[in-house]
Structure formats: C-alpha cells, structure tokens
C-alpha cells in the first residue's frame, strides 16, 4: 500500500498518549473491558492465559479486564507535537510508520463519513489513541497484551503499536503495513457498529454467538473499506491511498488466519480447542468475511446477524 505524496494528513484523528510522543512498532478483536471494549484478539489472549494459569476472566462485558492488571503505563497526557511536525503529507506516510498509521486512520474514516452521508446519516469520527504498555479508558484499564481495541464507552480506538511485532513473533503472521490497516479498519468497524446500535447484539460465546457475529461483521467492514481505499477521496478530492495490491490483501488474509479462535486456542492453549469459548470466529470464517467485504464493497453484504451460514 502506498499513499499519494501530495495528500494532506489530519493528525487530529490520532492522539498520542506515549508520554513524549516516541515511536512505536503494530492487532485488534473483542476485549471485555470494564465497559464492553471490542478488540481483535484481546479476549482470546486472556482466555488462553487463564487456561494456562494466568489471569482470571469473569463473565459479561463488565468484568474481564477492568481490574487486576496491576499498574498501567502513565502518559495519559496527549502530546501530538511530534505527529504534527512529522506527519503532514502522504510523502511523510510513505517513509514514517507513525504517519502511515495516521494516513490509514484518515482513509478509513473518510470512507465511513462518505458512506454514512450517502445513506442520509452523519458519521461521528473517533480518534485512535497510541499508548505504550498500559492505558486507562472509559471501558476500564488495559495493557498492551489486550491488543488493539475499540471502547464504545468513549468511542475511541486504542493501540500499542508494538503489538504488531508480537503478532509476527508469537502468532506467526507475515506482517506488513496492510496487516495493520486491516486491524485498524476492523476496530473502526466496531465504531460503525456502535453508531448503528449493532454493538448491543455482541453477547455470549460459542460458534454462533452474537460476539462471533459482531467480530465477523467488523472483519467484513474492514474488507469493504479495503475495496474502496484507493478510490475514496479526501477533502482535497484525491484518494489518500494510491493502490491496494494483491500482496496487501494476502497479508490481511494471512493475519485473519492467525487470529481465529481455533488457531489461537490451538497455538497458545496447548492444542485444545473449545468451541464454546469462541468469541471471534474461526480463521476460515474471518478470512471469508473479510473477503466478502473486499469483493463486494457493500456494507449491506456484511449482515452476519441475518445468516445461518457464517462459513
């Protein structure tokens, strides 16, 4: 994925909580934080750790990660000075990782602003917050082990960019910038669900649960954005992203295959797969729904709650 060198970046859509604004490195699903946070892999990781004698996970949306995390990182003060000075154009995004994340956030939100407008609604932007180590949110406290997540209580996306390194080393994903784009687009899919009132359906565990359907829909929404990424204009009238290659799509699908419930439970949980604990869907399902969104480019095709065939 590459960015138009001349396109402007909007750093106001990202808030840097990393203290002095230092650099980071870069996945997301459903995490049950104090107020019902939604992340790509967080709850799975904590389920696996609990099975291995690590943390204890409670039931429901109000108990899993809000307590017992020990001290979380400081740096709750927003300091965007570095982003503002370094991330001005697409040319900056092509050479600076933090700026690339800003560009991806801009592109995803530009798409949803325009999609909501086409349907006669108004999209309310949500900031992505960079943090290191730990963070306090409207959904409770979380550490970087949670993975990237969306908090409906404050309508923010949270990400410790170093988690993408763990995605490669611990989960075996191939990585790459479009992997990170897929994760961010997935989290913004949760924001869309929150705006549309769909988030409340994401309850329970198991292969056909509302939780799984919510996550697969967010994967599909990520695919929809990917379909439109190189054609969605910014305020200047030109798309921020110039192209999405087949290799980009392959990296997203590879990531989806590494964050399915079955893959993570088997890889990190000693080979045991408990379908009753599924919260995100299998690797095959996650690939299927991202592909559905990418191939159709239509949010309406992401109705995971209206189908008996999740894949």
Feature-to-residue mapping (PLM):
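Short helix/loop segments within enzyme catalytic domains
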Residues: 103-105, 109-111, 115-116, 217-264
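Pan-zinc metallopeptidase signature
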Residues: 260-311
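Long amphipathic alpha-helical segments used for membrane anchoring, targeting, substrate engagement
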Residues: 1-86
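Post-HEXXH active-site segment of zinc metalloproteases
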Residues: 194-216
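Short pre-active-site segment immediately N-terminal to the catalytic Zn-binding motif
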Residues: 165-182, 206-212
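Acidic helix-start/capping segments at beta-turn-to-alpha-helix junctions
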Residues: 87-110, 117-140, 239-247
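Active-site recognition of the HExxH zinc-binding catalytic motif
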Residues: 112, 159, 182-195, 219, ...
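Catalytic zinc-binding patch centered on the HExxH motif and its immediate surroundings
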Residues: 58, 134-160
């Amino acid at each position: 994925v590459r960015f138009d060198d001349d396109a402007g970046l909007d750093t106001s859509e990202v808030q840097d909580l990393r203290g002095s604004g230092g650099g980071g490195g870069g996945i997301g699903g459903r995490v049950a934080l104090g107020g019902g946070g939604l992340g790509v892999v967080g709850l799975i990781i904590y389920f696996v750790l609990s099975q291995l004698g690590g943390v204890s996970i409670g039931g429901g949306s109000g108990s899993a990660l809000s307590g017992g995390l020990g001290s979380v990182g400081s740096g709750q003060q927003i300091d965007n000075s570095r982003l503002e000075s370094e991330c001005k154009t697409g040319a900056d995004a092509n050479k600076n990782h933090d700026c690339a994340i800003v560009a991806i956030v801009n592109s995803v939100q530009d798409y949803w602003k325009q999609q909501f407008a086409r349907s006669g609604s108004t999209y309310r932007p949500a900031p992505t917050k960079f943090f290191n180590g730990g963070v306090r949110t409207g959904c409770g406290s979380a550490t970087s082990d949670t993975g990237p997540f969306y908090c409906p209580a404050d309508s923010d996306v949270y990400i410790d960019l170093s988690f993408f390194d763990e995605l490669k080393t611990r989960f075996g994903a191939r990585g790459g910038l479009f992997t990170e784009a897929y994760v961010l687009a997935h989290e913004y899919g949760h924001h869309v669900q929150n705006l549309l009132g769909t988030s409340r359906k994401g309850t329970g565990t198991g292969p056909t649960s509302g939780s799984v359907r919510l996550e697969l829909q967010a994967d599909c929404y990520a695919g929809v954005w990917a379909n439109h990424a190189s054609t969605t204009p910014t305020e200047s009238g030109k798309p921020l992203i110039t192209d999405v290659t087949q290799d980009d799509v392959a990296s997203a699908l590879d990531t989806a295959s590494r964050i399915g419930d079955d893959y993570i439970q088997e890889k990190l949980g000693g080979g045991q797969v408990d379908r009753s604990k599924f919260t995100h869907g299998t690797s095959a399902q996650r690939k299927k729904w991202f592909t559905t969104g990418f191939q159709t480019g239509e949010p309406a095709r992401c109705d995971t709650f209206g189908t008996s065939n999740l894949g």
